[in-house]
A protein has these predicted regions:
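N-terminal membrane topogenesis motif
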Residues: 1-23, 75, 198-214, 320, ...
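Signature of the first transmembrane helix
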Residues: 3-60, 96, 152, 172, ...
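Interhelical loop/hinge segments that connect adjacent transmembrane helices in multipass membrane
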Residues: 4, 138, 165-172, 181-222, ...
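Helix-loop junctions and terminal segments of transmembrane helices
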Residues: 27, 55-72, 249-287, 291-294, ...
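Interfacial segments at transmembrane-helix termini and the short loops linking adjacent helices
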Residues: 102-119, 236, 301-333
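Hydrophobic alpha-helical transmembrane segments
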Residues: 117, 142-189, 207, 214, ...
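Membrane-interface junctions at transmembrane-helix termini in multi-pass inner-membrane proteins
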Residues: 120-144, 329-360
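Membrane-proximal transmembrane or re-entrant/amphipathic helices at the cytosolic face
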Residues: 234, 428-477
Length: 477
């Protein structure tokens, strides 16, 4: 359990690092490039993500799981690693070839698409799945921390006006590529040489495609929404409003879903050893963790966004506020589906049920986007995303009904929902009355956190009581 906690903290640090960089740069970039520049970047980047998606064909999740299966068997681990690396080079190369002959050479944003080819190359050399599979998250954090800091400095040095969009894209894509490439420095000590003739790349194709299908579906409500806003409205600013709203929600989401990345290899390894009860014990704790964090984060974001958005993004981003309020529920929905899907169904090999859930979400999201975006623009996309995530979570609850009694779990954790609602009512009333400033936003966060924890203490929640007892014990020592 100690290793899981350490890996969670390392992975949490890594995920926060990935998202904290745009959080640091966003106030500056949103003012420098403007809503149109941000919208152009988001729109072109959403298209590039399709080529990365098809190039990787599910290899990230599959690679993480397969390495987890053989993490303690060095020879098998060597073979699996090199087989998957070769397969990845082949598939991403095909995707890159198609990319150059379609968008990069002939697209409307040719120069931006050309620079963003580095993103596709970055996906080719990405081996983070290997370190996640062997449950070693420390190396990922340290190496990428340095690269990300360099990226932030480059943005502040070179991006000075709305005409510097290409320079911004270079800073983004180059640091992504160098960050992934740098992880190879550890490989000589962790992976041995193998004979090429002894490798069988072909055997991995079918299982990766099985995992690839749900990823295609997932991309519809993680990437296609931005593409559809741009295509259906033709207003680049609307893409920016949606992108910025999602960005804030995703930063909060990182705290919760990081546990899924850590738990997946552990559950896969335990399942292989037939320790089913241990698996379920871990997941019940995951549910409690999600209820404890996700609900106050969701209601907290909805309560403070009217005070936060004006000073953080600057003028011209008022529509980000309703975007955040509407899309905030995905914090809870994705956190729950992360447990049932990423932490349970995938590691134990129940891909069909996982695929069913995300395909359902894909269809729902696409149809809702077609109906809502033309009428409500970015807000319509936000509504569609929430409905889609609700359908994914609903299907997964149904598929795991014999393994977990979700309603019993929800009832056992209802105190977190009640405490979050109490906090929301007070902060939602207070926030608009205060002048928009960094001090007042943090004041709302501190007051909200105090109300949430105080309410849990009043109703004598076990988690809070245990935490207080541990603190008392340590102080006593």
């Amino acid at each position: 359990m100690d290793k899981i906690v350490k890996n969670y903290l390392y992975n949490l640090s890594y995920q926060i690092l990935i998202l904290i960089v745009p959080l640091i740069t966003t106030p500056y970039v949103s003012r420098t490039l403007g809503a149109k520049g941000i919208g152009t970047f988001s729109y072109t980047n959403s298209i590039v993500q399709y080529f990365i998606l098809f190039g990787c064909i599910g290899l990230n999740l599959y690679g993480q799981r397969e390495i987890a299966y053989v993490q303690h068997e060095q020879e098998k681990r060597n073979i699996v690693f090199w087989e998957l690396v070769i397969l990845r080079i082949i598939t991403v190369s095909i995707s890159l070839f198609i990319y150059f002959f379609t968008l990069a050479a002939h697209g409307t944003y040719a120069s931006i698409f050309l620079i963003m080819s580095l993103d596709i190359l970055a996906s080719m050399v990405d081996i983070s799945w290997f370190f996640q599979g062997i449950e070693d998250f420390k190396k990922i954090v340290i190496r990428n921390f340095i690269i990300k800091i360099i990226g932030v400095l480059l943005i502040f040095i070179f991006v000075k006006s709305a005409d510097d969009l290409c320079l911004y894209v270079i800073c983004h894509s180059a640091t992504l590529f160098l960050g992934n490439l740098s992880m190879w420095a550890y490989i000589p000590k962790l992976v041995g040489r193998v004979r090429l003739r002894g490798l069988s790349v072909k055997k991995h194709v079918r299982p990766t495609i099985v995992l690839f299908l749900p990823q295609i579906a997932t991309s519809v409500y993680t990437v296609l929404d931005k593409t559809m806003i741009g295509f259906l409205t033709g207003i680049e600013e609307e893409v920016a409003y949606y992108e910025q709203g999602q960005k804030i929600v995703k930063i909060a989401m990182t705290l919760v879903i990081s546990l899924g990345t850590v738990m997946m290899p552990r559950v896969a390894n335990l399942f292989k050893q037939h320790q089913t009860e241990q698996v379920k014990s871990y997941l019940v704790k995951s549910f409690r963790f999600v209820f404890f964090l996700a609900f106050p984060m969701m209601f907290g974001l909805m309560a403070i966004c009217s005070n936060f958005v004006p000073w953080f993004f600057g003028n011209g981003y008022n529509r980000v506020v309703p975007n955040i309020i509407v899309i905030a529920p995905i914090l809870v929905l994705i956190a729950l589906s992360n447990i049932m899907g990423t932490q349970y169904l995938l590691p134990i090999g129940r891909q069909k049920e996982y695929t069913l859930s995300v395909v359902t979400g894909c269809i729902v999201n696409f149809l809702m986007n077609l109906i809502l975006i033309p009428k409500f623009y970015s807000i319509g996309a936000a509504i569609a995303t929430v409905i889609a995530e609700a359908s994914v979570t609903g299907v997964q609850i149904f598929c795991t009904r014999k393994d977990f009694c979700f309603w019993k779990i929800a009832n056992n954790n209802k105190q977190y929902v009640i405490s979050s609602l109490v906090m929301f009512i007070i902060i939602y009333t207070l926030s608009p009355k205060l002048q928009s400033s960094i001090i007042n936003t943090f004041l709302c966060i501190i007051i909200g956190g105090g109300i949430y924890l105080g309410t849990l203490l009043i109703i004598k929640d076990d988690t809070i009581i245990e935490a207080i007892e541990k603190i008392k014990t340590r102080i006593g020592k």
